[in-house]
């Protein structure tokens, strides 16, 4: 029973739409009505400005990061392979990612999983996240597309998990990569058409 409570709590924390909340509280804006219509960090930068964008990014990363430690904090007794699986920090963190992408508070229309996924990876393997961050910003510096940088970093996470032979991370990162690519499908189309906005601060 405690495992179910832990997973539900992870989902509900992940589902907190930080971009939407900050937009409403401090800017009187529904971020879904501007830019890409997304509630995540990238659209927060675009619609609410850099300070708010950084805050949303931090909060989205933090909500993924903190859920990884739920199995340590909750008095959960894993007495079989199934319960052991669902008390793994990555799996608990995955529920936060799913909450971010499909938040119950906003009729299951949320962000694109990038920052919250980064928080989960930070919690389980900070060195891998550092490598992925270097790749992300390297691609961003060259091409100026946040969406492309996110997709490439996600794919590199899948490859990296195979290299370090972390197969639970592999399964999670593969699933998240698929979700991330699907969520960025309109961005991909715009990139091929030359219509995707480029960042100007790098």
UniProtKB/Swiss-Prot annotation:
Pathway listed: Lipid metabolism; phospholipid metabolism
Instruction: Note the InterPro entries from the entry.
Output: G3P_acylTferase_PlsY (IPR003811)
Q: Which reaction does it catalyse?
A: an acyl phosphate + sn-glycerol 3-phosphate = a 1-acyl-sn-glycero-3-phosphate + phosphate
Which keywords label this protein?
A: Cell membrane, Lipid biosynthesis, Lipid metabolism, Membrane, Phospholipid biosynthesis, Phospholipid metabolism, Transferase, Transmembrane, Transmembrane helix
Main localization of the protein described in the UniProt heading = membrane
One record GO biological process: phospholipid biosynthetic process
Give the EC number: 2.3.1.275
Topology of this chain in the membrane: Multi-pass membrane protein
The molecular function terms in GO held by this entry are: acyl-phosphate glycerol-3-phosphate acyltransferase activity
Function field: Catalyzes the transfer of an acyl group from acyl-phosphate (acyl-PO(4)) to glycerol-3-phosphate (G3P) to form lysophosphatidic acid (LPA). This enzyme utilizes acyl-phosphate as fatty acyl donor, but not acyl-CoA or acyl-ACP.
The name this protein goes by in its record: Glycerol-3-phosphate acyltransferase
Tell me the organism: Staphylococcus haemolyticus (strain JCSC1435)
Recite the lineage of the species: Bacteria, Bacillati, Bacillota, Bacilli, Bacillales
């Amino acid at each position: 029973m405690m495992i179910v409570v832990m997973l539900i709590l992870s989902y509900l924390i992940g589902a907190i739409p930080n971009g939407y909340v900050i937009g409403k509280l401090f800017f009187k804006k529904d971020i879904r009505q501007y830019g890409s219509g997304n509630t995540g960090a990238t659209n927060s930068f675009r619609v609410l400005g850099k300070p708010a964008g950084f805050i949303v990014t931090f909060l989205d990363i933090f909500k993924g990061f903190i859920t990884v430690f739920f199995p340590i904090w909750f008095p959960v007794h894993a007495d079989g392979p199934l319960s052991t699986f669902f008390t793994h920090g990555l799996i608990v963190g995955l529920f936060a990612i799913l909450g971010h992408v499909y938040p119950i508070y906003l009729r299951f229309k949320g962000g694109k999983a990038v920052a919250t996924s980064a928080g989960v990876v930070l919690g389980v393997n900070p060195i891998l996240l550092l490598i992925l961050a270097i790749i992300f910003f390297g691609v961003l510096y060259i091409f100026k597309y946040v969406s492309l940088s996110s997709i490439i970093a996600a794919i590199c996470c899948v490859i990296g998990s195979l290299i370090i032979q972390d197969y639970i991370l592999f399964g999670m990162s593969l699933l998240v990569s698929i979700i991330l690519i699907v969520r960025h499908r309109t961005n991909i189309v715009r990139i091929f058409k030359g219509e995707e906005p480029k960042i100007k601060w790098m």
